[in-house]
From Swiss-Prot:
It comes from the Bacteria. NCBIfam families: rpmH_bact. GO terms for cellular component: ribonucleoprotein complex; ribosome. This is Large ribosomal subunit protein bL34. GO terms for biological process: translation. Belongs to the bacterial ribosomal protein bL34 family. HAMAP family: Ribosomal_bL34. InterPro entries: Ribosomal_bL34, Ribosomal_bL34_CS. It holds the Pfam family Ribosomal_L34.
Amino acid sequence: MKRTFQPSVLKRNRSHGFRARMATKNGRQVLARRRAKSRSRLTVSK
């Protein structure tokens, strides 16, 4: 049986990357929450 997780950096960044987060109001809220928590990584990209 094929595993469900087939990693792809491009798909990962397009859905969860910094520019994807910045593109929507809710995405910017996600970044704001992560900044407030002082997360070392805001998004999977970078």
